[in-house]
Amino acid sequence: MAVAVIQEFPIEGEDRTTTNYDRVQEALGVRENPPPGALVHTAGFDEEAGVFRILDVWESREAWDAFLNDRLLPVVTPLMEQGGGRAPETRVYELHDYMA
């Protein structure tokens, strides 16, 4: 069953740069090598909520978990340890329906 994954990073002060996001995307190489099971990816600032939000749709929880463990965490963990941000609040839920 398809799942939505929402990750939210608090906006810190007046910082509206996407430097960390862009570094992660480049390191992941998702444009050249899309992860299996990824259906939709969005990212942007939600000023009202005070967060930078990533919203993805995946074919299944298993596809998301594989991407998280095999590709995403190996890239972001060293960056966070070097002071490049903190872990987001992450929510995953099954979808009844989606359109892409």
Where are these regions (language model features)?
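Short S/T/G/P-rich N-terminal loop/turn motif that feeds into the first structured element of a domain
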Residues: 1-73, 82-100
